[in-house]
Curated annotation (Swiss-Prot):
Keyword vocabulary terms for this entry: Cobalamin biosynthesis, Glycosyltransferase, Transferase
Function: Catalyzes the synthesis of alpha-ribazole-5'-phosphate from nicotinate mononucleotide (NAMN) and 5,6-dimethylbenzimidazole (DMB).
The protein's name in its UniProt record: Nicotinate-nucleotide--dimethylbenzimidazole phosphoribosyltransferase
Enzyme type, top EC level: transferase
A GO MF term: nicotinate-nucleotide-dimethylbenzimidazole phosphoribosyltransferase activity
Pathway assigned to this chain's UniProt record: Nucleoside biosynthesis; alpha-ribazole biosynthesis; alpha-ribazole from 5,6-dimethylbenzimidazole: step 1/2
Catalytic residues of the enzyme: 313
Keyword flag Transferase: yes
The reaction(s) this protein catalyses: 5,6-dimethylbenzimidazole + nicotinate beta-D-ribonucleotide = alpha-ribazole 5'-phosphate + nicotinate + H(+)
Protein family according to the UniProt entry: Belongs to the CobT family.
HAMAP family: CobT
Tagged with keyword Transferase: yes
Highest taxon in the source lineage: Bacteria
Amino acid sequence: MEFATVSPPDPGAAAAARARQDTLTKPRGALGRLEDLSVWIAACQGQCPPRQFERARVVVFAGDHGVARCGVSAYPPEVTAQMVANFDAGGAAINALAGVAGASVRVADLAVDADPPDDRIGANKVRRGSGDITVQDALTAEETERALSAGAAIADEEVDAGADLLIAGDMGIGNTTAAAVLVAALTNVEPVVAVGFGTGIDDAGWARKTAAVRDALFRARRVLPDPVALLRCAGGADLAALAGFCAQAAVRRTPLLLDGMAVTAAALVAEHLAPGARLWWQAGHRSTEPGHALALTALDLEPILDLRMRLGEGTGAALALPIVRAAVAALSSMATFAQAGVSDPSAHP
């Protein structure tokens, strides 16, 4: 599918936010990165001061990967379906962390190798499991288009329902292997640079994972620079849908927090699908996966947090949400020097 042109966040609102920051009762720049975030939020909303986020929404994209049968994960493939049920029951880490951050959670089954718990979760299902990318394409061309369209449709559904900030999450045994292929292909690095320990594999598991990425990358590099073909060859329905989701959020001028390796790999593809989309995103955190740092560098995104996390699900991004809300509060609720009757150092050189 083709995405509409992405327009950048409002530069006038950004300039107004930066100017307002300099009038607040604090030394200029004293709130550090919080000030930069507030300027970004004002630009995304097109107003200064910005509104507080009231309808943050996490969407977890779930799918199985045939490469999981190559011993690339510490967990068996059936865990994906089991975790989808856990999300639905409210018992996963993302449920707990999103709850304390004030965000609601939706899970979407794109390619879990099992029947979905209900029609709502499976409404966008493309297939049961994606292909083993070491020997075959992850998807057909038609499935790739369906997955991209599904991700874009989910973004539209959430924005139309009132979401004012989106958080992208993932679940899929083997998905960091596919993600490493996407990142290595788009940043032109070798597998050993992009592959991490994922769910906690040992050295032998890392070697198997690196070999799997090597084999898939050999095939994936043949289809570059076509981002849709790359998703077909090495992505999977969940990652393709994530790419569509991230791209369409930007088209809809809705700020989005990225999570870890799988999400950011998909976002890297999304930036190729919809140039300029990255201006609507923030990196919620930096995971311990080496490929994640590569993808963030390629997107020119600075992570908000670094807590040595590697779970996925949207957990790192959910933890960043209170900081984003704090940035809004500082810009919108602090008094100016004039309002507070405090001497402004800039007025007395």
